Amino acid sequence: MVFTSPSWCQDILMPIPNNELVGEFVMRRGHGLNDVSEDSPSSVCAYTGKSYSIRDIRHNVKSLSKSLSQILGWDFNHGNPEDKVVAVCSLNSIDYVPLTWAIHRLGGICLLLHPTSSASELETLMRKANCKAVFTCKPLMAQCQAAFTAINGDPSNIFLVELPLPEEQPVKISNTTISQLIADGEGLPDLQPLDLQDFDSKERLAYFCPTSGTSGFLKIAKVSHANVMANILQCTTMDSYTTASQTDVTLGILPLSHAYGLLVQHFVTFRGDCIILHPKFDMQIALKSVQQYRIVRLYLVPTIIGALATNPILFKLFDLSSVKRVITGSASLPEQVSKAINQLCPEWEINPGYGLTESFVCMSWTSPNSQYPGSTGCLLPLVEARLLDADGSDITAHGQAGDLLVRSPSVMKEYLDDDLKRDVTFDSDGWLRTGDVATFKQNPKGDSHLFIVDRKKDIMKVKGIQVPPVEIEGHLVAHPAVDDAAVVAISDEDAGERPFAFVVRSQKVMTDIDEKSLKKDISGYIQSTLSEPYWLRQNIRFIDAIPKSHNGKALKFKLKQQLVTSSA
């Protein structure tokens, strides 16, 4: 059985362009969505108040591309795109995405590197992508220089992204800045017009997006211009059923180096929204900007929503009355956290979604038009999904869990230098194997909603019963003394496997209780809310922080390594 989007949202607002760059598509007005002036603020730096309109962005993209063309010797109409790869490794900046669009104007591809990557990871990814230039910021300059030098990169091709952050020990760096490149480009002659006669948006790559599952194995997803434009249109279509004629002020705290954050920046710019962009996440600074700019939409991850839910004092310290919608992705939103935030802010619409870097990005999204508590929403238009049982047969009924496969015009073509065979990632008909176990349920309106059960490789069997760790984790983070938690499977002679919880203690609640007593309290809490296969007993360990990947997912293989090390 093939699951699709609801009957009221079957097609996208307009065709996906087949001969256009994603930046040009986003920047041009006249889509028929919202009547927004080209001089209205499109992106604002939360720290300095500096803003860019679409007119400013278009000017900067043009000037940047001219400067880079002169320095690198590239132009759009000549050369292989995979020989024109530029790495961007920086904290958020209002220049970040326009920079990527300037690189696209030269026929180049942007490799997005996460700021928390180690020097060895940076070197591995730069080498694999055959990087020819790097844009980075002062805090990351040293490791980027080391990585680029290690792959014999030209040091003069390392450029600086300026950030509005104070420096503890100011360091003078002579690298050319984006501001200098824009200024220099203003005096250069225009580049040759883009020859798009043979350009295919489906085939031409826009971004190299590193991605890793809980295995920790780094891969690079090859994302085309059409992939990004498709998901912009899919999200815009779903969103248009409730907000077709209005623009919003939105909060930009998601890393632009991550697919979710990058998509949001493209999506809100296309809609005509104004995004208040933060270089990095700081809860109090973020909430202050919500108050200052009267932000309407928050794009968050579950851990931040959980932190808000467990710190109600924040709602007294800051005026958050402007907020109407909270969109969350990157990981599952525990139902207990959703209920807690709803009690604090019943006027907020909480809209969970589901997606992958490989599907760039969003596959399902909760529309105010169709709700189902605990779900990740309905499939977006043009997204198809299948569920396979243990025998590989298609599940044909609602309410039955199976391995989730998806197909969409936004799904990547393949991984770069694929170490995994394509038939491991995709089936013979082009369906992407997500690695997630999911189910579909119908709400009272008859719309099919997607529920993510857990990662396939994380689900444990206790006495033959499948136990998803995410369900235990959802209850753990609802405990007042728990800030964060991750659950893994351990071997058990009688049950086969049992859950083992790694818990980060709250620094504000029940701090006077010793670890033994708190373990007993948490264990009793789980026993009172879940059935016997989910019980933790004494399988609880307190740690300072849950190790996580760049996109906020728990690295459970590292937690399992801790168990092996401690038992050795």
Curated annotation (Swiss-Prot):
Residues 353-415 are annotated as: SBD2. Its EC number is 6.2.1.-. Residues 282-352 are annotated as: SBD1. ATP binds at residues 211-219, 352-357, 436, 455, 553. It comes from the Eukaryota. Pneumocandin B0 is the starting molecule for the first semisynthetic echinocandin antifungal drug, caspofungin acetate. Pneumocandin B0 is a minor fermentation product, and its industrial production was achieved by a combination of extensive mutation and medium optimization. Inactivation of three of gloP/GLP450-1, gloO/GLP450-2, and gloM/GLOXY1 generates 13 different pneumocandin analogs that lack one, two, three, or four hydroxyl groups on 4R,5R-dihydroxy-ornithine and 3S,4S-dihydroxy-homotyrosine of the parent hexapeptide. Keywords: ATP-binding, Ligase, Nucleotide-binding. The keyword Ligase applies. Pfam families: AMP-binding, AMP-binding_C. Pathway: Mycotoxin biosynthesis. The keyword Endoplasmic reticulum does not apply. GO terms for molecular function: ATP binding; CoA-ligase activity. It is an enzyme of class 6 (ligase). Disruption phenotype: Fails to produce pneumocandins or any new compound that might correspond to a deacylated peptide core or free dimethylmyristic acid. Belongs to the ATP-dependent AMP-binding enzyme family. Both substrate-binding domains (SBD1 and SBD2) are involved in the substrate recognition, and are sufficient to confer the substrate specificity. Acyl-CoA ligase; part of the gene cluster that mediates the biosynthesis of pneumocandins, lipohexapeptides of the echinocandin family that prevent fungal cell wall formation by non-competitive inhibition of beta-1,3-glucan synthase. The 10,12-dimethylmyristoyl side chain is synthesized by the reducing polyketide synthase gloL/GLPKS4. The thioesterase gloN/GLHYD exclusively interacts with gloL/GLPKS4 to maintain turnover of the polyketide side chain. This is Acyl-CoA ligase gloD. It comes from Glarea lozoyensis (strain ATCC 20868 / MF5171). The gene is gloD.
